[in-house]
């Protein structure tokens, strides 16, 4: 089940709010400029499906987002517990960073924890299958895929380079709860 946990940035041990209804999650995130929607990921995706197969299965939704927001690059990130670089990738994504463009993810399968550091608050968004999240450009955040990752997500970008992070050097992510496997 998708969820949103809100903390004050200096109190990672004490949540201010815990939400589990999609409408409540979406409205709370909308207040800080983050888009969250539930989509029907009804197209079957076989285990080990190629990037092209995943993109083809969701072509209608992808094209709508591209038209709506001007995204030009689409790819698929797919990680599971057998991935040889899972520990290195997890460590990289767990460092607080920002992007010069929106970070858009549509979860086709599995789950991941997007944690957003906005002003004095931290918003931990557990995204699962059928969740779309769009994090505005410049938003400090990190992502946890867990020790035993399992997710497939479509990513959309405004630039042809794809995922380009600007790391903040802040160790705040180390003080907040991680995705529990």
From Swiss-Prot:
Residues reported to bind Ni(2+): 97, 99, 103, 141
Site (Important to generate the dianion): 105
Binding site for Fe(2+): 97, 99, 103, 141
UniProt cofactor(s): Fe(2+); Ni(2+)
Claim: Acetylation is one of the keywords in the record: no
Documented EC number(s): 1.13.11.54, 1.13.11.53
GO biological process, one term: methionine metabolic process
Molecular functions (GO terms): acireductone dioxygenase (Ni2+-requiring) activity; acireductone dioxygenase [iron(II)-requiring] activity; iron ion binding; nickel cation binding
Family matches, as HAMAP family: Salvage_MtnD
Protein function: Catalyzes 2 different reactions between oxygen and the acireductone 1,2-dihydroxy-3-keto-5-methylthiopentene (DHK-MTPene) depending upon the metal bound in the active site. Fe-containing acireductone dioxygenase (Fe-ARD) produces formate and 2-keto-4-methylthiobutyrate (KMTB), the alpha-ketoacid precursor of methionine in the methionine recycle pathway. Ni-containing acireductone dioxygenase (Ni-ARD) produces methylthiopropionate, carbon monoxide and formate, and does not lie on the methionine recycle pathway.
Family named by the database record: Belongs to the acireductone dioxygenase (ARD) family.
Protein name: Acireductone dioxygenase
Natural source organism: Pseudomonas aeruginosa (strain ATCC 15692 / DSM 22644 / CIP 104116 / JCM 14847 / LMG 12228 / 1C / PRS 101 / PAO1)
Gene that encodes the chain: mtnD
């Amino acid at each position: 089940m998708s969820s949103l946990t809100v903390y004050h940035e200096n109190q990672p041990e004490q949540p201010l709010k815990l939400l589990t209804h999609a409408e409540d999650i979406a409205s709370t995130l909308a207040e800080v400029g983050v888009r969250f929607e539930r989509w029907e990921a009804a197209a079957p995706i076989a285990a080990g499906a190629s990037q092209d197969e995943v993109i083809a299965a969701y072509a209608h939704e992808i094209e709508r987002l591209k038209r709506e927001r001007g995204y030009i690059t689409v790819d698929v990130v797919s990680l599971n517990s057998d991935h040889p670089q899972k520990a290195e990738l997890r460590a990289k994504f767990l460092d607080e960073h920002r992007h010069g463009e929106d970070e858009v993810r549509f979860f086709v399968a599995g789950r991941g924890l997007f944690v957003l550091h906005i002003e004095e608050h931290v918003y931990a968004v557990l995204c699962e299958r059928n969740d779309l999240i769009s994090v505005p450009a410049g938003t400090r955040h990190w992502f946890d895929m867990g020790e035993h990752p399992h997710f497939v997500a479509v990513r959309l970008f405004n630039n042809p380079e794809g995922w380009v992070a600007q790391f903040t050097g802040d160790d705040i992510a180390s003080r907040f709860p991680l995705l529990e496997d």
